[in-house]
Every structure is written in C-alpha cells, then in structure tokens.
Amino acid sequence: MAEREVRLMKGNEAIAHAAVRAGIDGYFGYPITPQSEIIETLAQLRPWETTGMVVLQAESEVASINMLYGGGGSGKRVMTSSSSPGVALMQEGISYMAGAEIPGLIVNVQRGGPGLGTIQPSQGDYFQSTRGGGNGDYNVIVLAPNSVQEMADFVDLAMNLAFKYRNPAMILSDGVIGQMMEKVVLPPMKPRRTEEEVIKECPWASTGRTRGREPNIITSLELRPELMEVKNRALQAKYEEIRNNEVRFETLLTDDAEYVFVAFGSAARVAEKAVELAREEGIRVGLFRPITLWPFPERQLASLAQGKKGLLVVEMNAGQMVQDVRLAVEGTIPVAHFGRQGGIVPEPEEIVKALKEKLQ
C-alpha cells in the first residue's frame, strides 16, 4: 500500500482501508446491510498476511462485542462494526467495556427501525449512542462523519480517543455515507504496536505474565456499594474531562445568519444545500454541524445561537438530537424540528419549506 493514496470508494470500504492503515490489531464483526462491505473489504485486503491484523467473522453481534472486550482488555487496538439492530445486541457488552474502562471502536452504519425496520438509511440511533444504550451511568465517545473522507479519518481519531480516555468510542454513520462513493485520501500506514509497546503504553492491560508487575484484573464488577460509588464518580470525572477537551463541530455561514440549521451526518449534507437555496431566496441561513454527538457541543451552540431568530434541527428520525439542542439554548430562542423517517432522506427544498412554516 502507498503511504498516501487517493481512491474512489464507498464509505464502508474507506473504513476497512483506514483500519488496516491505522495499525488496528483486530476486527471482529458480523455481516448486516448496509455495512457488510466493511468486513468484505477487509477479507479482500487480507491484512493478516501484511500487518498481522486479525479479521474474524463472529457467530453473532453479541460474540463480536465480547471479543472486543477481550481484545481491548489486553491493550490491543480492536474494532467491530454493525448496523442498528446489530448494535442494539451489543449494548450489554458496550456497558461492560465502559464499566471496565476498556478502549475499543464500534462503527454503526445506521438503518431504519425500530425492530428489523428497513435497510434504508436512518439516524434513529442517536439516543442509543449518546445516552448509553446499556445499563448504568456511562457514555461512549461518538463521532458523526458526513463524508467518505471523514469515515476514513475518524477510524484512527476514534481509536486514539478510546485509548486516551480508556473508553469505548463509536463512529455513528448511516447507510447514505456507508454506501455512497467519493474521492478519499487514505491515511499513511501506521505500524501495529509491538508487545513491548503495548505493555509500556497500557500498564492497566491484562497482558499475561509481565515481569516486574502484578497481574491486572479487568472487570466492571464491584460488590461493595461504597467502592462502586467511588468508581462511578471517577467515571463521571473522566466524562467531564472529555466534555471539556474533545468537542468537535463545524459551522457554515453562521456569522450573518438570522436562522441556523443544526444537522449531523448525511442530513447535514442536505442541510448545506438547503442553506444555499434559502440564501438564493434572500433568507440568511447558516449551518451548525456537531461532529461529536457525545460530547455534544452545547456551549458552542448556545454561544452561536445568541441573536439568532431560530434554529431548525434537521434529522432522519422523529426528533432526537433536537432535545440536546433545546437543552443547549435553554429556551432563549425558538427551536423547531424537521425530520423524515422510514429510510427517506429529506430534500433540500423540504427543509427550506419547513423553515418558512415553522420559524418565519
């Protein structure tokens, strides 16, 4: 593989190529539409012959996430991927990883629900991802790409954040980004870490018999309530550190805007076109795109919203991120929602029409 390579490929394929180039140690997954190209591309790349990366098709999503627990617990850079109903099956394992402070990467290429739903794209997993879909008080770092390039770029970023904070991280994509094809600049190759580097960089990891160190026990269990409370408070302190340091977002034409669209992922691409159409009609509109859905850029959005006439939250769901937007602005300006469901991607003209009807 070239150090840097420009290719035309699907978002799912970009995830696979970026995983190999990011020095990932192992991928454990199970095919499900619309993300099956991730494991298919990894099988075609055969990285076990070049970098030594393990690629394993597990028997289920439940098995996949528990393999992630084991791999991450040994200090390895490991990942899995699935789509909405498959990620729902992983929630217990994600909670266990958060409780045991085990790093790992989960890629969710969303499809419509609830239940089996449809194979068409959706953003209906926002609550599940940002609120912690398993039991207990925990959070997952959530990055929302809106291009094939970001699909590739976020693999290494998410994994680095996972290890920096010893916490699961998620790339929350959708079927549009996963299946669309764009030009992408693949990142340079990063070698996998040696066993010595793993032991040095991850002193907490369970690495077997390690000279000069007591064995590490990886667990989320603590039966003494007073110690479990201490553990939970330590987790919350870590989450506050993440909130203070890892917020990411993007703005477009917001300085002179009277109204602002708030959207993430593929919906933000459509909203960007809606900004163009609205401005052609003389309506000054901008776009605020959260890149980290957790931590949500609440302070940055609240600051931007000052002096605006209203915010229109555009999503491919019944209204989920809109709750975080309303919490951020605390009733200081009107907030409306426009969403399509069932796998339908909104049209830019619909968004402009919704702005006129709901906020003007």
State what each model feature region is.
Residues 7-44:
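N-terminal glycine-rich anion-binding loops that anchor highly charged ligand groups
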Residues 8-14, 236-259, 272:
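Glycine-/acidic-rich phosphate or pyrophosphate-binding loops and their flanking alpha/beta elements
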Residues 37-131, 141-163:
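Thiamine diphosphate
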Residues 140-197, 350-360:
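Structural signature of the thiamine diphosphate
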Residues 166-251:
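Conformationally flexible catalytic loops at phosphate/diphosphate-handling active centers
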Residues 248-284, 288, 294-300:
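Redox- and metal-dependent alpha/beta enzyme cores, enriched for Fe-S-associated oxidoreductases
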